[in-house]
Amino acid sequence: MAGLSHFDEAGRAHMVDVSDKPVTARVALARGEVRMSAATLALVTEGRADKGDVLGVARLAGIMAAKRTADLIPLCHPLPITKVALDLTPDPGLPGIVVEATVRTGGQTGVEMEALTAVSVACLTIYDMVKAVEKGMEITGIRLLLKDGGKSGRFEATP
């Protein structure tokens, strides 16, 4: 399967051998949104959710998820993550919460999956913490915005 590095010549899945790759600085930025009603957003931003600090708990969940990515995604390498930061921004225009995760490492492979996992789990945590109020929330737009470092260089998503 040409172009798909996680498959061998016979089409069997395998973990890519990165042992000959140089250690370089890597960074990835991912983004997602949790869309909800204006009333639910107010509940979150005013700290009135029954389960507590929605944004604080979601931030911690995203950080924890980034560190556990190799346990969740079968062919991801365990990496020495040097930074995970999550920004959770209320956006009345959605209405909802915009979640962005930045992940850094000095390693032989990138941290795109860690950033995407952090965003995904933070969004799921927001949903979990307020689903009693609104089950129709929508998790949307999860995507990689930026990756830099390594052989393939820099990628920036188009707006």
UniProtKB/Swiss-Prot annotation:
Keyword Lyase: yes
Reaction(s) the record says it catalyses: (8S)-3',8-cyclo-7,8-dihydroguanosine 5'-triphosphate = cyclic pyranopterin phosphate + diphosphate
GO biological process: Mo-molybdopterin cofactor biosynthetic process
Matches recorded under CDD domains: MoaC_PE
InterPro entries: MoaC (IPR023045), MoaC_bact/euk (IPR047594), MoaC_sf (IPR036522), MoCo_biosynth_MoaA/MoaC (IPR050105), Mopterin_CF_biosynth-C_dom (IPR002820)
Enzyme kind, highest EC tier: lyase
Gene3D superfamilies, alphabetized: Molybdopterin cofactor biosynthesis C (MoaC) domain
Oligomer and partners: Homohexamer; trimer of dimers.
Record HAMAP family: MoaC_B
Stated role: Catalyzes the conversion of (8S)-3',8-cyclo-7,8-dihydroguanosine 5'-triphosphate to cyclic pyranopterin monophosphate (cPMP).
Similarity field: Belongs to the MoaC family.
Protein's UniProt name: Cyclic pyranopterin monophosphate synthase
Source organism of the structure: Cereibacter sphaeroides (strain ATCC 17025 / ATH 2.4.3) (Rhodobacter sphaeroides)
